[in-house]
Amino acid sequence: SATTLALATIVIAMFLRPDPYLVANKESVTKLAKGDTKKALKHIRNNPKALFAILSIAIGHVAMVSVMVMTPVHMAHVDVTLTVIGLVISIHVLGMYAFSPLVGALSDRLGRIRVIQIGIATLLLSTIVSGFARADDAYTLGVGLFLLGLGWSCTLIAGSALLSESVESAFKASSQGASDLVMNLSGAAG
């Protein structure tokens, strides 16, 4: 893993141009005055696209967390080994992150709302596949959890892009913070 991290660092250092850190330092930063968080929340509340974006992110996260957390427990009840459980969760994580660039490109090509819809449909399919799988059927659970991760990726990436497009520049950071808060509270409550 250290070798992979070192290689990734070298690739990023060589090919990431322009450096986002340097670009950010050159641009003027809009600072929110005290009380502007309330204005940002009001801006989101009055913006149907922003609300839809945050809702889709939260729904995707609740579905993902609920199924992801319970699957290892379900498998352990019939004495599936930790190695197999770990493999199923690894396949899930692959679904969450491996196709992120593709999901972003699809979001640009097909539109944010369409990719969110695809994500919700994928999440629904994943719960059906996982829900009907036997606890010792690692293959079917792996497929279900892969789809779960992929659906989550679709709702999160397209939802975040839609949110960013839907709010004024002055409210982008506060809106993303509100989205993260809602997403994580929803996941904890789900």
Task: Describe these PLM feature segments.
Residues 98-112:
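Helix-to-loop junctions at the C-terminal end of transmembrane segments
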Residues 3-26:
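C-terminal membrane-cytosol helix-exit motif in multi-pass small-molecule transporters
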Residues 122-135:
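C-terminal ends and interior cores of transmembrane alpha-helices
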Residues 170-190:
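A late C-terminal transmembrane helix in Major Facilitator Superfamily
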Residues 154-167:
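Intracellular juxtamembrane helix-capping segments at the cytosolic ends
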Residues 18-53:
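Juxtamembrane intracellular "pre-TM" segments in multi-pass secondary transporters
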Residues 45-63, 146:
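Pair of pore-lining "gating" transmembrane helices in MFS-fold secondary transporters
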Residues 69-85:
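Short amphipathic helix-loop junctions that connect adjacent transmembrane helices
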